[in-house]
From Swiss-Prot:
Belongs to the PEP-utilizing enzyme family. One of its GO terms (biological process) is phosphoenolpyruvate-dependent sugar phosphotransferase system. It catalyses: L-histidyl-[protein] + phosphoenolpyruvate = N(pros)-phospho-L-histidyl-[protein] + pyruvate. Its main location: cytoplasm. The active site is at H189, C502. This is Phosphoenolpyruvate-protein phosphotransferase. One of its GO terms (molecular function) is kinase activity. It holds the Pfam family PEP-utilizers_C. Mg(2+) binds at E431, D455.
Amino acid sequence: MISGILASPGIAFGKALLLKEDEIVIDRKKISADKVDQEVERFLSGRAKASAQLEAIKTKAGETFGEEKEAIFEGHIMLLEDEELEQEIIALIKDKHMTADAAAHEVIEGQATALEELDDEYLKERAADVRDIGKRLLRNILGLAIIDLSAIQEEVILVAADLTPSETAQLNLQKVLGFITDAGGRTSHTSIMARSLELPAIVGTGSVTAQVKNGDYLILDAVNNQVYVNPTNDVIEQLRAVQEQVATEKAELAKLKDLPAITLDGHQVEVCANIGTVRDVEGAERNGAEGVGLYRTEFLFMDRDALPTEEEQFAAYKAVAEACGSQAVIVRTMDIGGDKELPYMNFPKEENPFLGWRAVRIAMDRKEILRDQVRAILRASAFGKLRIMFPMIISVEEVRALRKEIEIYKQELRDEGKAFDESIEIGVMVETPAAATIARHLAKEVDFFSIGTNDLTQYTLAVDRGNDMISHLYQPMSPSVLNLIKQVIDASHAEGKWTGMCGELAGDERATLLLLGMGLDEFSMSAISIPRIKKIIRNTNFEDAKVLAEQALAQPTTDELMTLVNKFIEEKTIC
């Protein structure tokens, strides 16, 4: 059996189609001066062909996925035709006498590598998008064939080293039953698109292309993260039964989509989605999100050569506000720094950037950045129910300073005659132990909290979650972290405020009952997790969850705490 990263759930049975393209061989020899213009023309001609292909793919993506996914390829075209990218490639051809393919490869690979070095998984996996564009450009420069996946004529399970977003957009969905790749991650655009299509997929297997041949009979079990190659009839029968069970469960979960997250004894909470762009709103709605608990705005600042203007930001926030209608959207101001550096901002070299110049620290030092973003959010609030949230807060002084700035920007907009929501709510992320321990004081200054468990866990336990040597110590359900979370929830309630959670823990099924019992008011997560979390909440009693939370928080170790939680789940047969 083969396993990897479960990208999109489901089970598929079918023959393997192994995708192999001609190898791209880069010509690295130096060219003579009289060949420079010829190589520049090769680059420009190859780019024109690649752009035309992407335009066709964009149109097909719009027809298949809707406008949200069409925008992915609009972004690909913009990057391919980026003036700075063009100048860098032409400069290498002219100044270093590189061939068109060598120059294009060096520039594209440099951008992809820079993204891969980030700690944020979503941003790291944008490297695959950049390489997708680069591969298409190189194949056109070199005159190599490009596989047309829309021409597949029989039912198959695709097996490939990797599938790019542009390849995924071309799939013949009547014939492609699922796919398996050597590379890739759960938050890559390819995985996101597979989930949009509800197409079973396992990525990141490492070596599936070396273990599978064309025509092999496969079972792609993207429920239990297993790939079976030429299985026995007994295994096929067993997995057919699992497939029926999955279909039944999926139908049951779908019935919960538009139902409230309310317990058997009448306690109601909100279940919302985390999004990065307006493209994600459609998936949130399809899975029954009751709003957006985290809109990550930093993606507006990435893959550019300058800060986005107020007008550019206003257009993006307005699009999300209008797409969400009457549902609330919590807009987090840019969380740049740490693992998310911007090349155009000249970040200082820091020994520990996660504890350095980042998030609101940048915003308060560079007031023009704060001004443009907050004004844009305020203006967009006239078109929907937006809330503003500031990350990486450690003190009351910071919150007061930020609120003072907001009042200045509100007055500017009044003077300019520009509409905004005068009563827009202001909140902060609680993701540092400093904020958690003064939560009672912070609650007097803001309208709501949202707990960021990823960083809160990392800072509380002094564990770098990206360090494989100590990653086992990264335990969001440790008693120390959970007791801090309880302290934050209680502090907000004491001041008549509410607390949400937008970290990974909010979508962790093992933690749902515990967080519910601790009094969490809002759960925000990846959209695909919403139906299952709603099911858990609707199948339990709030009073039982409170008893569980009280007992669990009294446990001295993570193991003892988890034993208690698992026993409760088994006895109540909730999940």
